Design a protein with these regions (language model features):
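Family-specific signature for flavin-dependent thymidylate synthase
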Residues: 1-261
């Protein structure tokens, strides 16, 4: 029988700030006292530090007096980020990127995920190069009444992948790689679109806010709700200031207090 899988979500990369370079810049513009106040690690890490740095650059709001138009400076990072969200100054969120490894997600899911192009980058396991031997598969909850039939069908498709590769002599010595690639590419057409695959996904904070909201909405595709429900949990903990307005309702929808940022 095919291997039954479930999506696994890993946050594998987050922003890292060069504090010495940041300090040198701030010294040049007269804002070094801000970093002294702000340099203690906060719950939002370097991602939120970078967002705040970008935002304060726009108004030269490192401290009162640097910009004659600025008479009051929010010193609390969370309050500052809340004002960024409230004023829809979303461009500064685009400086901070986070990378996720999505393991055992279906190609149904990845086909929808990669439609989010702005502020995102993807690298997906290629079935043109990676030959299918074991087909991982997750039975969607709505198909539970016909689970056995689903798994038997996937098993037959898996057996075909193996038998076809044998019949086409793919593992015989001396078969050129370009031949293996051509056959592997052809065989993927006989694989279920629901098979499990992996994709690396990078998104900036602005995009993450948008996608988490859209893909956990009540009408979103079931597996996408599962994947981005978990992404929402991770980002609520990872960037608690930028996601401070997000709340999860009883339906599992992540809803922001400020939807247009």
């Amino acid at each position: 029988m095919p291997q039954e899988t479930a999506p696994e979500i890993y946050l594998i990369a987050r922003p890292a700030v060069d504090r010495e370079a940041m300090r040198a810049y701030l010294s040049a513009v007269g804002g070094e006292s801000w970093l002294e106040r702000r340099d203690s690690p906060g719950p939002g890490g370097d991602g939120e530090l970078l967002v705040e740095f970008a935002g304060r650059t726009c108004y030269r709001s490192w401290e009162p007096g640097l910009n004659p138009n600025v008479t009051r400076v929010r010193e609390d990072p969370r309050a500052y980020l809340n004002n960024i969200l409230k004023s829809a100054h979303g461009s500064v969120l685009e400086h901070a990127n986070y990378t996720f490894a999505l393991h055992n997600v279906s190609r149904v899911a990845t086909h929808e995920i990669v439609r989010h192009r702005a502020g995102a980058a993807y690298s997906q396991e290629s079935l043109r190069y990676v030959r299918l031997v074991d087909i991982g598969f997750r039975v969607p909850p709505v198909l539970e009444p016909v689970r056995q039939q689903v798994l038997e069908l996937v098993e037959r498709l898996e057996e075909f992948q193996v038998s076809a590769a044998m019949a086409l002599h793919l593992d015989e010595e001396g078969i050129p790689f370009h031949v293996k690639k051509e056959v592997t590419s052809a065989l993927r057409r006989l694989a279920p679109i629901g098979l499990s695959t992996d994709i690396i996904m990078t998104m900036n904070l602005r995009t993450l806010r948008h996608v988490v909201q859209m893909r956990t909405a009540a009408g979103a595709e079931e597996e996408l709700r599962l994947i981005f429900g978990r992404v929402g949990e991770i980002m609520k903990a990872e960037a608690s200031g930028v996601f401070q307005d997000f709340e999860r309702d009883q339906r599992g929808c992540w809803e922001p207090g400020f939807p247009k940022v």
